[in-house]
């Protein structure tokens, strides 16, 4: 409503569809693997090294997409900026997964909350003042970058026992262990979003804005399911590896 229906459709596609798809590519499906790696088969440096590679590739794919898409300059810029926003989110996810793996889930929640509040406030404030989606997107990316630096990058450096080194060949081994997870999350999200891609190609931007509002409850259900299950994964991994099967089964029953 602040920028009009057409801008709403552009943002819906840029943020919840293509941008989120690039998040999934950069994310690589590693989060569940990392937070359950309580035996530290891989170091934080291994996870971060692979995530930097996947984030870089996601940026390149996003840039290539907007080059060949035939969009106007403003739409292409908004789509690419939302790709950058989501890729920064994927990079921050590596740090937040390490917080959880080290038993500091509260830091994960704080980081996610503070980054989201900062970026959403800057985005909506800019949009309300200027009415320009492109300007608001620039502010959102800037706020996301600052939030990542303050609430992830600086925080993890204060934690003990975080191993930044990565042994030769470990990133490739980690890639091999997670490549099927990568395909599963990318293909799953494509199936989830195929209707939005079809509308974006064959209908007007304002139609996608309306469809996005109708589609939103499905996204919320999926998001809430993640909030409920994900915090328990590290505890489940610890109970399984230490042989505390009674506690393991109790958590499973509570979740069920």
Language-model segments: what does each one mean?
Residues 1-23, 76, 133-134, 138, ...:
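Interfacial/gating helices of multi-pass transporter permease domains
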Residues 13, 39-53, 175, 212, ...:
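Interfacial transmembrane-helix starts/ends
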Residues 13-16, 20-25, 52, 56, ...:
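Alpha-helical transmembrane segments of multi-pass membrane proteins
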Residues 16, 51, 79-82, 86, ...:
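Residue-level signature of transmembrane alpha-helical cores of multipass secondary-active transporters
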Residues 23-42, 101, 214, 219-243, ...:
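Helix-loop junctions and terminal segments of transmembrane helices
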Residues 30-42, 87-113, 134, 241:
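Membrane-interface junctions at transmembrane-helix termini in multi-pass inner-membrane proteins
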Residues 76-83, 109-159, 177, 215-218:
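Hydrophobic alpha-helical transmembrane segments
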Residues 106, 110-111, 134-140, 149-193, ...:
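Interhelical loop/hinge segments that connect adjacent transmembrane helices in multipass membrane
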């Amino acid at each position: 409503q602040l920028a009009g229906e057409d801008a709403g459709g552009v943002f819906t596609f840029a943020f919840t569809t293509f941008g989120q798809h690039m998040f999934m590519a950069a994310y690589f499906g590693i989060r569940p693997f990392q937070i359950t790696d309580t035996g530290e088969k891989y170091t934080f440096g291994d996870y971060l090294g692979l995530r930097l590679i996947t984030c870089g590739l996601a940026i390149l794919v996003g840039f290539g997409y907007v080059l060949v898409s035939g969009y106007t300059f403003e739409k292409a810029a908004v789509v690419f900026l939302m790709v950058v926003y989501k890729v920064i989110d994927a990079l921050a996810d590596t740090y937040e997964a390490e917080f959880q793996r080290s038993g500091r889930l509260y830091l994960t929640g704080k980081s996610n909350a503070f980054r989201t509040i900062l970026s959403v406030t800057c985005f909506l404030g800019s949009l309300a003042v200027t009415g320009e989606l492109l300007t608001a997107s620039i502010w959102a990316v800037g706020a996301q970058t600052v939030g990542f630096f303050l609430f992830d990058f600086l925080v993890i450096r204060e934690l003990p026992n975080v191993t930044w080194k990565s042994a030769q060949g470990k990133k490739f081994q980690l890639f091999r262990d997670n490549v099927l997870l990568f395909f599963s999350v990318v293909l799953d999200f494509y199936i989830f979003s195929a209707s939005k891609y079809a509308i974006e190609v064959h209908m007007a931007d304002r139609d996608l804005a309306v469809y996005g509002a109708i589609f939103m409850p499905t996204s919320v259900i999926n998001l809430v399911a993640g909030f409920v299950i994900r915090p328990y994964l590290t505890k489940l991994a610890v109970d399984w590896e230490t042989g505390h099967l009674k506690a393991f089964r109790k958590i499973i029953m509570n979740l069920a």
